Amino acid sequence: MLGWVVTFLVVALIAGLLGFGGIAGASIEIAKVIFFIAIVLFLVSAVVGLVRGRTRV
């Protein structure tokens, strides 16, 4: 799940750079949505990992 969070975060950052650079105005809103989704997914996966107490082997 953490891999998906990182993927969405990278996509959001790229879309944000393109949008704020003036290349695509619509990508600003897309970047905001994807960024917040990535933050929520990161927090959820962090909490689940802490609650389960998983250790990596």
Curated annotation (Swiss-Prot):
Protein name per its UniProtKB record: UPF0391 membrane protein RPB_2024
Similarity remark: Belongs to the UPF0391 family.
Annotated membrane topology: Multi-pass membrane protein
Any one Pfam family match given in the protein's UniProt record, by short name: DUF1328
Coiled-coil parts of chain: none
Recorded superkingdom: Bacteria
Keywords, ordered alphabetically: Cell membrane, Membrane, Transmembrane, Transmembrane helix
NCBIfam families (UniProt xref): PRK13682.1-3, PRK13682.1-4
Source organism per UniProt: Rhodopseudomonas palustris (strain HaA2)
Location relative to the cell: Cell membrane
Gene Ontology cellular component terms for the protein in this record: plasma membrane
Ranges annotated as spanning the membrane: 4-24, 30-50
Keyword Transmembrane helix part of the UniProt annotation: yes
